[in-house]
Amino acid sequence: MIIIGNNPYFWIKSIILQEKEYIKGRGAQKNTNNRFAEFSNELRDDFLEFCRIEGEISDRNKTQYLPIFPKTIVNKVSSPDVGMNYSLNPYQGCEHGCIYCYARNTHEYWGYSAGLDFERKILVKKDAPALLEAKLKSRSWKAATIVLSGNTDCYQPAEKQFGITRACLEVFLKYRHPVGIITKNVLVLRDLDILTQLAQENLIAVNVSVTSLSEETRRILEPRTATIKKRLETIRHLSENHIPVNAMLAPIIPGINSHEILNLAKAVSDAGALSFGFTVVRLNGAIGQIFEDWIRKTLPDRANKVLQQIADCHGGSLNDSRFGIRNRGEGKIAQQIKDMAHLARQKYFKDKVFPKLNTELYEAYKGGQLKLF
């Protein structure tokens, strides 16, 4: 039990936020119950009133950075439809606050909520660079592109403080090992010195997420992310430095950004992207509840229509977990999205080719000795 102040009246088992007002600067507007936890929790109004009277700060919107110490850092990706074989996540949870993020559910495995906890409690893996180096020195490891990150953005705000992603990139460069990056943060340009060296040997590919050309849409979907203008500038800077960029127009959400596919494709192509990918939004696990709560607070006039159109893409449900279908959807609306994406590729990417990364430069000696390059 946690004792609040000196008054046993305020003893509570645990605390979780249950907001009534709109929380600016956050995607999720509440914490959902953790499906793995035995008890559900609630932050009571009387506790908040107690904090006000006593002059104590409840820190309801403060981000916490919590160190964790995993034994391994390179993860084998078993899903056959996500376009990567291995991932590395320097952080768990993400302060960007993207309301649709599929990684929210993973926070429940750590005992937290997929809602506000996902954005406020960031788990930091400070040992990631050392664990990565140990993996690359392993006798059994065979070169295959490792993606930063398969789950949460490796250039989220925490990276500016901890620098774990940069340290990992230094390891990849040292071992001449191919690496991919997925981000929507302009902080990636901080590491241009390392990225250009990797690019010279065809060891790097950067995926930049661009979900809308509307700042209004961006602000409500992804409240703590870089502006669209800055993301397009990021694509341009990377491309000008001969770093191959794939744009992620994901997720496509019917009724919110589905009408922007052609304009988005043109914008990222003009900025220098060599290709683009897309997914149709699916709201698996706790994300369905979080998204519905969010859309009824932010876009109440469109909420029912958007939710219905998402369901139309997934057989009447907000989620479809079938491999090969879950990220593209089915039905009339999903087909329209696919057709628009196909047209965009033909119109803006027809003569562009995305390079295959080089796995031949990486060769480790047994016993952890590295062949000199």
Each language-model region and where it sits:
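A structural motif corresponding to the C-terminal end of an alpha-helix
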Residues: 171-177, 233-245, 313-316, 340-351
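Active-site glycine- and acidic-residue-rich loops that bind
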Residues: 186-189, 253-262
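Conserved Radical SAM active-site core
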Residues: 8-9, 13, 56-92, 96-207, ...
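Auxiliary Fe-S-binding modules of radical SAM enzymes
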Residues: 4, 9-65, 69, 259-373
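Short hydrophobic alpha-helical runs that function as membrane-insertion/retention elements
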Residues: 180, 246, 276-278
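Conserved strand-turn element in the central/C-terminal portion of the radical SAM core barrel
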Residues: 213-215, 222-224, 237-257, 281-283, ...
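Glycine-enriched alpha-helix->loop->beta-strand junction motifs that scaffold or abut catalytic
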Residues: 200-203, 244, 272-274
